[in-house]
Structure formats: C-alpha cells, structure tokens
C-alpha cells in the first residue's frame, strides 16, 4: 500500500491520503473548497492505510447534490464479507451556497470540478479539496513547465553562487 504522509509537522493528525498532482498541471485552478465525503467503514480503514487514487476522478453536480465520480479506494483486506465497491460514486457534503456556486461555475464553458487532495483533518474526518478548474491548452502547459524549470534553475544558481 501507499505510504500515508503527514502534511504538517506541527499537526501529526493531518494526513494526506491521495493527491492529484496532475490537476495543477492540466488545469488552471480558479478556487478550491473543502468538502466532507460520505464513506463506508471499510473505505475509511482502507484510506487510513493509504489505498486511494483520485487522479482520474472528477466531481459532478447532479439533482442538487455533489458527487465524486470514478475515485478509487482499495479494498480493505480484513473486511471479507462487507467489502465496498472500489469505484463507486461517493456523495460530497457541502453547503447549499457553495453547491450553487459550483453549479454556476460548471455551466460556464470549459469549467470543471477537479479533486485536488484527499486527507484526514485534525479531528480524523475524511475531507476532500475540490477545485473549480479550466482546462489548459498545450501551449499553456508548456509555459507552466518552462516557468517551473526556470525557477528551479534560478534557485540552483543562487545556491551555487550566492
């Protein structure tokens, strides 16, 4: 299983389970919101072991509710008979105002809801950060990569010479 990493050194209870690093490269994130997620017991235990992937998933507003679609949570080995479905749709908990904001955002051309990080907060509750994003064109992706490479090169030069 994947290793669960602690995101903050000051708070050992804040644990990142899955991160969609590709989303920041493929999309321009306009805003993000923390949402609760409804899980079954075996899903929570599997998440605590680090068995999750949100890279191919997305969020959708359907019938006045927010759903996480195509996210993968590995089966929990000790839950033999009460096993959860690995790629089921999971309901996200969000306020009505944020839900209407998400609905309005997705109605604009090219906008989508992308999961960014799945983690346990300081109270031990599973949370997911959803971003309102617009897909980048190929030249935008190249520009982002060039800026990232230049900043790395600058930091190397400053470290070596300064």
Swiss-Prot record:
User: What do the Gene Ontology cellular component annotations say?
Assistant: cytosol
- Any keyword Flavoprotein? no
> Pfam families, per this entry?
SmpB
Q: What is its main location?
A: cytoplasm
The GO molecular function terms of this record are:
RNA binding
Disordered: region residues? 140-162
Disulfide bonding pattern of the chain: none
One GO term under biological process is: trans-translation
Keywords, sorted A to Z: Cytoplasm, RNA-binding
SUPFAM superfamilies named among the record's database cross-references: Small protein B (SmpB)
Q: Which domain of life is it from?
A: Bacteria
Could you tell me where this protein is found in the cell?
Cytoplasm
Q: Which PANTHER family match?
A: SSRA-BINDING PROTEIN, TMRNA-BINDING COMPONENT OF TRANS-TRANSLATION TAGGING COMPLEX
What family is this protein classified in?
Belongs to the SmpB family.
Summarize the protein's role.
Required for rescue of stalled ribosomes mediated by trans-translation. Binds to transfer-messenger RNA (tmRNA), required for stable association of tmRNA with ribosomes. tmRNA and SmpB together mimic tRNA shape, replacing the anticodon stem-loop with SmpB. tmRNA is encoded by the ssrA gene; the 2 termini fold to resemble tRNA(Ala) and it encodes a 'tag peptide', a short internal open reading frame. During trans-translation Ala-aminoacylated tmRNA acts like a tRNA, entering the A-site of stalled ribosomes, displacing the stalled mRNA.
Q: What is this protein called?
A: SsrA-binding protein
Native organism is Roseobacter denitrificans (strain ATCC 33942 / OCh 114)
The protein's gene is named: smpB
